[in-house]
């Protein structure tokens, strides 16, 4: 009795759909997309789906179903006068209805995690389509009908098909006046355009893994599932990836400045290291920096040569007195010259004064890598810039210190010695009286000697250099002019 009642309900449902009338509570308006509803209690669509799934006979007026539908034909069913659509497939191939389809036919909502797909959406590679793409022209979203079950749902049937997956949709371009699109629900793993492949469970999971988020939230269509996927993608974009390092600002930054000489970071290229070294300012005396050592050098290790001596040492008694009283104030400059031998570059008078005092060591700056050119420049600079202090400056300083009360006995003695040295070096004054007759006699004798020398040069005058000739002629002209002048007196 129950089967007959279901058969009659399916027949009436098919007749009303062919005539374009609103026979069931779940039927869509004219031109709208129609899908069997599992939430609103539309028994007509659900009973029709159960009838097709159980292999019952087709309706007398509008529906024709092939019980021996092969996978190639896809088990299509359509109303009379309606051309077949690409997606209007019927997945039931004589499979008896499961208990889940009866429960959904009675108006019970599908379980959580059910996914919808419209058969009229082509899928070339067998990828499952979301039910949100199957909304009809009428703007009513289709309701999930329990095509595929998520985690915790009822298992698939032995045939690998989802229970109650009946095709209740027509073609979008149907010539019927009803004009309604009935979107059939297709199990995962099936392909459209009339090629029905048995959707295995493994194939469904292999090809539809990317719909896990959408299937877990898919009770009412693709709206809530789309929002969930969008939220997941937004959080994924905002959160840093696993390969990105979370760097705290300020901890990994290297110090800035012109004198930074530390190593650069590990993720920096060789070009940035060279740029940072170029920014470093050169240190003063870069040629000599790090290559000079000040030591107390034995005098016996100095070579007795004067390659860089510019003038003789002269009298070093005063310098020796100052060194004996004050010590050596300034070290000398040397450079290595063989094994345990050194060459003196600057400080010859200081070394002579130390030897005068019978000392055995001298304070010296050893220039480890000093070229001949640099050594010569150093010796010249010391001699040129050692400007002697004039007596006027020394006297002014003595008067200034005496006025300030700072002129001690040692300072006075040093200044007096310096002034005495200047007086001894001054030329003697001309105080001797000269006799003119004696001077004239002396000049006459010298002129006679010069005339004899000129007579000797007359024989070789033509062979002389032009510059020598000009110089002799200039002196003779001066003498001739002087003779004319003296004769006129």
From Swiss-Prot:
Residues where CTP binds: 311, 322, 327, 329-330, 347-350, 387
> Which keywords does this Swiss-Prot/TrEMBL entry list?
Chromosome partition, Cytoplasm, Magnesium, Metal-binding, Nucleotide-binding
Region feature (Disordered)? 1-289
Q: Does the keyword Oxidoreductase apply?
A: no
Q: Which Gene3D superfamilies match?
A: 3.90.1530.30
**InterPro entries hit by this protein:** Chromosome_partition/occlusion (IPR050336), ParB/Sulfiredoxin_dom (IPR003115), ParB/Sulfiredoxin_sf (IPR036086)
Which example biological process does GO assign this protein?
Answer: chromosome segregation
Loss of function: phenotype:
Mislocalization of ParA and of ParB, nucleoids are more compact, bactofilin patches are mislocalized. Synthetically lethal with smc or double scpAB deletions.
Q: How is the cofactor bound?
A: In the isolated C-terminus structure with CTP the 3 phosphates plus 3 waters coordinate a Mg(2+) ion.
Residues annotated to bind DNA = 346-367
Q: Where is the composition biased (Basic and acidic residues)?
A: 62-80, 199-208, 265-288
Q: What Pfam families has UniProt attached to this entry?
A: ParBc
Q: GO molecular function terms here?
A: metal ion binding; nucleotide binding
Assembly, per entry: Homodimer. Interacts with BacO and BacP. In situ probably interacts with monomeric and dimeric ParA, in vitro interacts with ParA in the presence of ATP, and with ParA in E.coli.
Protein purpose: A non-essential component of the chromosome segregation machinery. An adapter protein that recruits monomeric ParA to the bactofilin scaffold. Cooperates with the bactofilin BacNOP complex to correctly position the ParABS chromosome partitioning machinery. May also play a role in bactofilin complex assembly. Upon expression in E.coli associates with DNA and causes nucleoid condensation. CTP-binding stabilizes the dimeric form and allows ParA binding; it is not clear if this protein can hydrolyze CTP.
Concerning its family, UniProt says: Belongs to the ParB family. PadC subfamily.
Q: What is known of its domains?
A: The N-terminal disordered domain is not required for interaction with BacO, BacP or ParA. In the isolated C-terminus structure CTP binds betweens helices H2 and H3 of one subunit and H4 of the other, stabilizing the domain structure and allowing interaction with ParA. The ParB/Srx domain binds CTP and probably ParA; CTP binding is required for ParA interaction. The flexible C-terminus (residues 426-489) is required for interaction with BacP but not with ParA.
Name of this protein = ParBC domain-containing protein
